[in-house]
């Protein structure tokens, strides 16, 4: 009973999740017009400046209607950990709440949401891309060099892990690269869940084929809106390459490879669509196992009413 009472006393926050191309932005703007909400973006691609078309970043008109926080905060050469998102989102949520308004968190990066609702796990889950990058470095420089890198990052773990133990050495480095914190530091501290009463919603079409059609339609709009020129401009920079998190965003890698002559235009389009469908599939897999989640159909006329009713927030 005490936990329930405590929950009721926490400030409200709305989570609006969903796969890519499901209609999150349109509904979020409607919510901002009906409720005293302010949007915080929960999207690992929208954080990057100069990556507007391929990420389907909200338009200037949409941003004028409903400003989004945590958009355009980093240069594409920079990386951004889940821990950094959690820190920035909590600061934004506190600012919004202190002004008597409601944080509305909108996006499709599920690890970001989990960091808020469940707290940051003591040790992050394995990331095959980060692991592959570490193994590539090991092939080039040797595990001894990576062990020396670990000594600089986490001397306690380096003392415990032998240079000839690639599995544990790789994991310790992976944890640091994902979270920005050492294994030793994370083992000592676990951040609790964010102190908010969350109302959690997911929006998606009821039919997977409709979602795929929406993905294709949106991808073609991007191609016709200057996406190729956007990537040409990014590619012209000497400091950007395909191993960066920003350039691993769906669509960008495929366009980059097309510009390098690795495939023809139609193949680039097909690979970009396949990567986007895979992203949507992963997002939906996360959401199907999500606890206390209210589902909304993309095409329902009652989504705004249902969010207002189920979140029990009064205007």
Swiss-Prot record:
**Which residues are annotated as site, described as Interaction with substrate tRNA?**
109, 131
Keywords assigned by UniProt, alphabetized: ATP-binding, Magnesium, Nucleotide-binding, Transferase, tRNA processing
Give the record's GO biological process terms.
Answer: tRNA modification
Quick check: keyword rRNA-binding in the entry?
A: no
Q: What is its EC number?
A: 2.5.1.75
The protein's matches in Pfam families, at most eight in alphabetical order, are given as: IPPT (PF01715)
Has UniProt tagged this entry with the keyword Lyase? no
For substrate, which residues are the binding ones? 20-25
Q: Where does ATP bind?
A: 18-25
Cofactor names from the entry are: Mg(2+)
Q: Which InterPro entries match?
A: Dimethylallyltransferase, IPT, P-loop_NTPase
Which reactions fall under this protein's catalytic activity? adenosine(37) in tRNA + dimethylallyl diphosphate = N(6)-dimethylallyladenosine(37) in tRNA + diphosphate
Top EC class for this record = transferase
User: Could you tell me which residues belong to the region Interaction with substrate tRNA?
Assistant: 43-46, 167-171, 248-253
Please give the PANTHER family that the UniProt record associates with this protein. TRNA DIMETHYLALLYLTRANSFERASE
Q: Which family does it belong to?
A: Belongs to the IPP transferase family.
Subunit details for this protein?
A: Monomer.
Any idea what this protein is called?
Answer: tRNA dimethylallyltransferase
Supply the source organism for this entry. Pseudoalteromonas atlantica (strain T6c / ATCC BAA-1087)
């Amino acid at each position: 009973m005490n936990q329930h009472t405590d929950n009721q006393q926490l400030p409200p926050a709305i989570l609006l999740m969903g796969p890519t191309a499901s209609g999150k932005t349109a509904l979020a703007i409607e919510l901002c017009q009906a409720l005293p909400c302010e949007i915080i973006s929960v999207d690992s691609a929208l954080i990057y400046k100069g990556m507007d078309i391929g990420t389907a970043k909200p338009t200037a008109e949409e941003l004028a209607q409903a400003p989004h926080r945590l958009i355009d905060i980093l240069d594409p050469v920079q990386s951004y950990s889940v821990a950094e998102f959690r820190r920035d989102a909590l600061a934004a949520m506190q600012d919004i709440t202190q002004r008597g308004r409601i944080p509305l968190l909108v996006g499709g990066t599920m690890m970001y949401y989990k960091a808020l609702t469940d707290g940051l796990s003591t040790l992050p889950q394995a990331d095959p891309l980060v692991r592959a990058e570490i193994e590539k470095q090991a092939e080039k420089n040797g595990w001894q060099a990576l062990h020396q890198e670990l000594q600089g990052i986490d001397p306690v773990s380096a003392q415990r892990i032998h240079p000839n133990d690639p599995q544990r050495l790789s994991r310790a480095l992976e944890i640091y690269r994902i979270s920005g914190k050492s294994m030793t530091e994370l083992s000592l501290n676990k951040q609790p869940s964010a102190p908010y009463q969350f109302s959690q919603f997911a929006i998606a079409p009821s039919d997977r084929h409709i979602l795929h059609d929406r993905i294709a339609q949106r991808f073609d709009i991007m191609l016709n809106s200057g996406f190729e020129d956007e990537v040409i401009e990014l590619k012209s920079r000497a400091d950007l390459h395909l191993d960066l998190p920003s350039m691993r965003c769906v669509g960008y890698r495929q366009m980059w490879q097309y510009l390098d002559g690795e495939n023809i235009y139609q193949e680039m389009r097909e690979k970009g669509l396949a990567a986007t469908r895979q992203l949507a599939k992963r997002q939906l897999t996360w959401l199907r196992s999500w606890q206390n989640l209210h589902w909304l159909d993309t095409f329902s006329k009652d989504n705004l009413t249902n969010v207002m009713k189920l979140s029990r927030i009064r205007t």
